[in-house]
C-alpha cells in the first residue's frame, strides 16, 4: 500500500478562458472542479496506474466532504482526519492560452490534537508499505512535521518519499528517505546556485545523496529529468512533447506517482524514471491529471 498525506487539501475550481481581463467582468466558457493537493494528486495517478493507495490528511466542513467524495470517485481509498468548525479551502485556477493564474486560499488551522491523531494513524502503516510526504504545511503545523514523521517511523521498513523543499526536505535527509524529488528551481534555492544542465543537476543530486537520500530525482521542466539511484547509477532523460502543454499543476506529483508505480511494475530504476516522465507529460497535456491511455502513449517514445 502507498499512503499519501495532504496536509492542506483543496477543491480546485478551474476556469479555462482565452484572455482574462483584470478589473473587468469576465465570462467563463468552461469550468471544472477537481480535488487538489499534492498528496491527493499522487494517489489519483497511482490509482490510474493500478496501484493500491490511501489518501490521508486533514479536511473540514462541506468543502472537505466534497474533497473526499471527489477523491473516492477516482477509486482512491481515503483516511482523512476531519477538522471541526472550519472549512477546507477552495483554490481558483485560471488557464489562459499563454499563462496560468492561481489564487490559493489559506485553509483551516490545524490544532495539535489533530496532529496527534495523524501520528496514531501512521502507527498502522506496515513494513514494506510506502508513505509520500509532499508539499508545504498549513497554519498550526510546525516545519518539523516531516522530520517528526520520519523519526517516528524510522524503525519500520517503510519507503518514505519526500517531495518538498527547504527545511521541510533537508531535515528528513538524516532518516535516509527512499526518494526525494526537488525540481531545478528548488535545487538551486537549496544550494544557492544556478544550474544550467543535467550534469550539474546530478552533481547537486549527489550532495543530497551524501546527506542521506537514497534516490534523487531532479525534475527540470522542458529539459527533462535526471535520477541518481541508490546504487550510484545516474540516468538522464529528455522531456517528451511539451507543445500541447495546457497545465503544469500536478506534473511533479504525477512524476512521483509514475516513478513509484514504474518501479513496482518493473523493479528497474531507468524504467521507473521513464514512467515518471511519461506520467508528468500526460498531466501537462490534460486539464486535470494523467490518464492511463496518455501515459501508455507517452511510454512508446522510450522504446
Language model: regions and residue ranges:
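Conserved phosphate-binding/catalytic loop of the ribokinase/pfkB sugar-kinase fold
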Residues: 83, 94-127
